[in-house]
Amino acid sequence: MNFFTRPDDDYRFEVIVVGGGHAGIEAAFASARMGFKTLLITGNPDNIGWASCNPAIGGSAKGIVVREIDALGGEMAKTTDETMINVRMLNTSKGPAVQALRAQIDKYSYSRTMKRKLEEQENLLIRYGIVEEILVENGKVKGVVDSFGIDYMAKAVILTTGTFLRGKIFIGRETMEAGRMGDFSARGLTNSLIKLGFTVGRFKTGTPARVLKKSIDFSKMVRQDTDDKPWAFSHFNEPKVLEKDYPCWLTHTTPESHKIIRDYLIFSPLYGEVKLIQAKGPRYCPSIEDKVVKFERESHQIFVEPEGKDTQEYYLNGLSTSLPYAAQIKMLRTIPGLENVKIVRPAYAVEYDYIDPTQLYPTLESKIIENLYFAGQINGTSGYEEAAAQGLIAGINAGLKLRGEKPIVLKRSESYIGVMIDDLVTKGVDEPYRLLSSRAEYRLLLRHDNAHLRLAKYGYQVGLIPRWFYDKIINLENNIKYHIERLENVKVPASSSVNELLQSLGTTPLTEGTRLAKLLRRPEVSYNALKHLDPEPISDTDVIEQIEIQLKYEGYINSMLEQVQIFEEYENLPIVNVIFSEVPNLSTEAREKLEKIKPLSIGQASRIPGVTPADILALLTYIKKK
């Protein structure tokens, strides 16, 4: 009798996902829902889907990504809708290209809900473990080994390790080996990746203190309630209006706050005499030390946000710091409303390892080890939404590869997810990457309102979107097209009643008859205001929304679609079996970069830093001659 044998179903899987954060959740759901026996192995099953930093989902560009995840069949949007306690549409004074939802979530409920859904998911098992080694045979992944020496076999492995690879926490000059306060640090896995040939770097992030609600004087702050309008992140859920029980609050730092920060900089692991933190932090989420040192301002905004319904802890958005605890409490008590504040958990910075994402294909599969995928902060990104999107794509593509089917690679012109992944694998990262609307050159096409129209076909294609929902999208598209064509032919007379209405809306009266579609192109005019002029009134609010946007922004949208068409002629020109050292007239830098990145198309090659238009011309000439 062999005492150490185990049943096959205990250690043999088709897909293993390492890490139970936002990337790991989506990867595991995608794999299991596509029918593959999946293991989610995580260092703390009680912290699955934990909001390690701000208790919020969405935001500028990020909110659109959550909608895209939902359209592809992911879970983040649905769980956000179930657990949000305050939600607002951002940038409502601007055009639809930059509008996005942001929700405060009950972080405890969010984590519990995600864990329950994962536990209930068919084909999926959650298990405790800290992975120390990747098992490889003949250049192909075959499994992992955990810190107990237990091995697990699989045909594909997805690494979603967050900030835990050699994670190290800093509070002043005090340090602790952990990827998150009160959690562990995974030390062996980085060494395994380095041995396999991966280039590894180090980044830094941070989080603010959590403070006690009853020690806050909200009377000195500005209240921010949830929107009065109903909202939902998920296309599967009915929009709802939330109760105004959990407002956020706005306050600010003071000159006295800044003086304390400057006085304590000598003890800062970032700016002190001994610079303990060498890694680069996120440009778009700087610590309060960075703000005070780099920006000459009297004050900086602070958003005071509830962490959940059943907790007294509040999150201080905008006050990330790694200053010593004494500096933290003194500085906080100089802020209006926080004069008597009590800290529940101190702020801290954390350093962690990431891999160079140019070592990945656009599918998020490694170029070095076959069937090994990476998603989330291990790829150099920051943010729950960015991580979840990568996890979903990695999970889908791992499943498609095991099926022997073509992978999904989303274009820059059809999704923010496509923009992000293309940026990562083509340009790489020298600081934590955050999605911004400015990164998307076709952002007017990538709106909050049309994510399902853009991406549901892919979700349905891989089996993550049900047939009834896909049929609903097809029907919606047909209705939009039908009604726009119809409205182009609905005549509106230049009558006194019509002109009185137009003047009341603040727009020019008619001198002659026109078409209803032409009137709807005016920025001041809504369909509902002119609905009585339509012989076939539209009641579907989704159809009305799309008609108004498509008509009002028709010129811009058509111009952008023309740009996309020109761009995609090159984007779709594949680079197959090209030995770049044999391409004449390439610059030395371009040759080195092309050899490293191994772009799959001329479009991808053109976006590699250091590759010039002359290099692209040389490459095009060579490919055409072949």
From Swiss-Prot:
Cofactor(s) needed for function: FAD
Location(s) in or outside the cell: Cytoplasm
Molecular function per GO: flavin adenine dinucleotide binding
GO cellular component, one term: cytosol
Gene Ontology biological process terms in this record: tRNA methylation; tRNA wobble uridine modification
UniProt main location, coarse: cytoplasm
Binding site for FAD: G19, G20, G21, H22, A23, G24
Annotated keywords: Cytoplasm, FAD, Flavoprotein, NAD, tRNA processing
Chain residues that bind NAD(+): 281-295
Pfam families in the cross-refs: GIDA (PF01134), GIDA_C_1st (PF21680), SAM_GIDA_C (PF13932)
Family indicated by similarity: Belongs to the MnmG family.
Summary of subunit composition and partner proteins: Homodimer. Heterotetramer of two MnmE and two MnmG subunits.
Functional description taken from the UniProt entry: NAD-binding protein involved in the addition of a carboxymethylaminomethyl (cmnm) group at the wobble position (U34) of certain tRNAs, forming tRNA-cmnm(5)s(2)U34.
Name of the protein in its database record: tRNA uridine 5-carboxymethylaminomethyl modification enzyme MnmG
